[in-house]
Amino acid sequence: MTIQFTALPTENVRALQRGGPDAYGRPPERKISDGDGMPCRHCLRNIAAGDVYLILAYRPFPNPQPYAETGPIFLHAQECERAVGARLPPEILDSPDYIVRGYGSDDRIVYGSGGIIPTDAIVTRAETLFEREDIAYVHVRSARNNCYQCRIERA
């Protein structure tokens, strides 16, 4: 099974970088990165120390519903290139482990699919989840704070 790590869509990110409202209808906050743990969800790279970044509320689901978690994410304030077609875990996945959880075509959690997975086992876990017909896509989330990192899809 071939998988790919998927970043946020460029059209959504550009709107936010231009001051558009986040999931709560608020403009993104602008901060200066200290270079420690500021993962951009568009280029899937860490935001360098001294660079301006955005912090905002994001809902990585098409519609609000009980399982549509909304939470804080970081983006480069300046336009960056979207990471496309990555088959290996991106640079931003540099913690020891992450929550890896499957979602159905209805954008709801598939119960029993989630777990805290060592970073070096994320690809294998995603491939195993995709053997199930009820898994449409997978989220990678922070194991400490549940923050959305990226999506994994079948390639």
Regions found by a protein language model. Give the residues of each.
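Conserved mixed alpha/beta catalytic, RNA-binding, or beta-rich assembly cores of soluble enzyme
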Residues: 18-118
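Short Gly/Ser/Thr- and Asp/Glu-enriched loop/turn motifs at secondary-structure junctions
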Residues: 142-147
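Short, hydrophobic/π-rich interface segment
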Residues: 101-137, 141, 154
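Extended boundary segments
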Residues: 1-17
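Short, charged/polar low-complexity linear motifs in solvent-exposed/disordered segments
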Residues: 66, 72, 128-129, 155
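C-terminal edge-of-domain segments
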Residues: 148-155
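Functionally constrained cores in energy, signaling, and assembly domains
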Residues: 75, 126, 149
